[in-house]
Amino acid sequence: MANHDPISDMLTRIRNASEKRHETTRIPASRMSRSIAKVLQKEGFIAQISEEGEGFKTQLVLELKYSGKHRHPTIRSMQRVSKPGLRIYKNTRGLPKILGGLGVAIISTSKGVMSDRDARKQGVGGEVLCYVY
């Protein structure tokens, strides 16, 4: 079955694994999924990224992070913003601040995929892919 929105699929896999307290989750590898995973790791939502397989069967293995004695997920919510049917673009001044700066908006810019903070620093806008907090 064809996957028409691989970014939504990635976010759903991470969200489900996090809610079930799984150590890792596997995601089909692509340039976009690697970029999003690197931003999540840089922002502290994912512990480690590795790859398994080769060719078009390559998968990203994401090691999820939890906090505290009761292993609360560091990812509380992930929301897809720009969808295939309705793309959402923002300029530098229009980039959203998620929970007053506690969350992250992941932006696809002309300089690559980055967090909203990095996009503001570099003075670029782009497509708002998702919110993570």
From Swiss-Prot:
The keyword S-adenosyl-L-methionine does not apply. It comes from the Bacteria. One of its GO terms (cellular component) is ribonucleoprotein complex. One of its GO terms (molecular function) is rRNA binding. Pfam families: Ribosomal_S8. Residues 16-25 have a biased composition (Basic and acidic residues). One of its GO terms (biological process) is translation. Coiled coil: none annotated. Keywords: Ribonucleoprotein, Ribosomal protein, RNA-binding, rRNA-binding. The keyword Phosphoprotein does not apply. Transmembrane segments: none annotated. Residues 1-29 are annotated as: Disordered. One of the primary rRNA binding proteins, it binds directly to 16S rRNA central domain where it helps coordinate assembly of the platform of the 30S subunit. Part of the 30S ribosomal subunit. Contacts proteins S5 and S12. NCBIfam families: PRK00136.1. Belongs to the universal ribosomal protein uS8 family. This is Small ribosomal subunit protein uS8. It comes from Prochlorococcus marinus (strain MIT 9211). The lineage of its organism: Bacteria, Bacillati, Cyanobacteriota, Cyanophyceae, Synechococcales.
